[in-house]
UniProtKB/Swiss-Prot annotation:
Any Pfam family matching the protein: HSP70
Function comment: Acts as a chaperone.
Top-level taxon: Bacteria
Provenance organism: Haemophilus influenzae (strain PittEE)
Matches recorded under InterPro entries: ATPase_NBD, Chaperone_DnaK, Heat_shock_70_CS, HSP70_C_sf, HSP70_peptide-bd_sf, Hsp_70_fam
Induction: By stress conditions e.g. heat shock.
GO MF annotations, alphabetized: ATP binding; ATP-dependent protein folding chaperone; unfolded protein binding
Transmembrane segments: none
Protein's name according to its UniProt entry: Chaperone protein DnaK
Presence of keyword ATP-binding: yes
Family in the record: Belongs to the heat shock protein 70 family.
Amino acid sequence: MGKIIGIDLGTTNSCVAVMDGDKARVIENAEGARTTPSIIAYTDNETLVGQPAKRQAITNPKNTLFAIKRLIGRRFESEEVQRDIKIMPFEITRADNGDAWVNVKGDKLAPPQISAEVLKKMKKTAEDFLGEAVTEAVITVPAYFNDAQRQATIDAGKIAGLDVKRIINEPTAAALAFGLGSSKENQVIAVYDLGGGTFDISIIEIDNFDGEQTFEVLATGGNTHLGGEDFDNRVIDYIIDEFKKEQNIDLRNDAMALQRVKEAAEKAKIELSSAQSTEVNLPYITADATGPKHLALNITRAKLEALVEDLVASSIESLKAVLKDAGKGVSEIHDIILVGGQTRMPLVQQKVAEFFGKEARKDVNPDEAVAIGAAVQGGVLKGDVKDVLLLDVTPLSLGIETMGGVMTTLIEKNTTIPTKKSQVFSTAEDNQSAVTIHVLQGERKRAADNKSLGQFNLEGINPAPRGMPQIEVTFDIDANGVINVSAKDKNTGKEQQIRIQASSGLSDEEIQQMVRDAEANADADRKFEEVVQARNQADGIAHATRKQIAEAGDALSVADKEKIETAVAELETAAKGEDKAEIEAKIEAVIKASEPLMQVAQAKAQQAGGEQPQQSSAKDDGVVDAEFEEVKDNK
């Protein structure tokens, strides 16, 4: 069997590494570089990848694709995609399934299909170095990638001819690269990963015990639409706006000019990491009736920092939240690892150092650490690297919608993966023959406030009173963070499952907003949950009371029956409202009005010589009421 290579599939640049003896080695590509631009160009005769594609971008802007990772697993209508449409020189289009695809020379291409070209280049680079075929890989993704984005990355690997043995989170890979072989007994590190298109922060504990190293992710967070591209776009907008003020010409309408400005903006940003100012000179950038126009602009480091300071500040806010989730204080962090090319910016380094009160490590290559870590994980899977245990986490809570529109969480965020969790639910109606399992992801109590990942039906449930059938719902997250959900009728053994494949996955802004909303609305969520619990109790008591009235028959006087039915009707009316206290008061009223019912039941029991029945319960022990839709045949 050949080696398992490690690939950092980046937004801006990609990198490939492999275990060489007991160390991971980054492999140079055909151009002699250790990283490859994640750029793909389609010409009349061939497909170019990497530096050759980048060199011809100015003359072929509409067919030169970059930052495709920002589109992977996203819907066309999403805010992030709509924002990118305005600034990308190539055409982003809506696929038949609603995904964001790219139109190249009249053909619609899916992001995994395009990303596969970069992976093919990485595969060929490794094969040239090793002198043998490569078929297996570990590929890294941002820690905050959702299920759809992870699956799309696996699809890209398949298209490239690779068996993706593991998807590993980028900060975790960087921690592996940093900590492998360390003799320190116990250390907690923060990995701040600001790449070309994504941002991640992970708090990771590295333990050494009896010769075995354990890398345990305590918490993770980030933004899958924040990175160097966004920094570049701020500079691009500034250059274009300044030129428009001077010449009254908007370069955004000229794809070739826009590509030249993009290259100049990226170059200026990089130069300002070591210089205090730089000149942007683009002669013959465009022309009008008066003749050719030239662009000349001086940009200072201070100006650049003013343009992007809010982006850096937002990353620090994510850092605070993840530290809180990890249950760690700033003083408990032993080392800070900076990963991703954008961390070379002095402002980023300064703000991170100010937050932690110490400088980040300088001995970790931000462009190569992730690929090295992926290669180490490949070595672990292959058995070449021993005594290393990696414990990663899922970034968001997972659950299903239950009675009253509540999200019942089965797996909490920052749970170590792989993991499996089951819970028993039941039906909400008598003789319900089918249920719909609605799978959710998020941190809010109200189901509608979370992200829907998909739904499926479990049919063929035997007719039974509500609350009697036992439906076991199981969530299973594998080591790649990919989700499987199943539902099983414990009475009949019938089972249905779904592998969550909806490409309308969570956006970074939705994820962050969910967490922020959950914190800001904790009190509102608590009150909502209490009202729902009261409603569910009211519903159960109303159902049980009506059943007892029917069973009592003529043994119950007309006056008592009317009194009880009136109390039940008032309870049902109260349950439609938002007043928990009123619902509870009406529950007490029904219980009081139902005393004659208990007397009738006791009399019947005594006549039959049986035991006195206990008051009916709205719930069976260990069974959670769940409101499922009944699936009806349309015949």
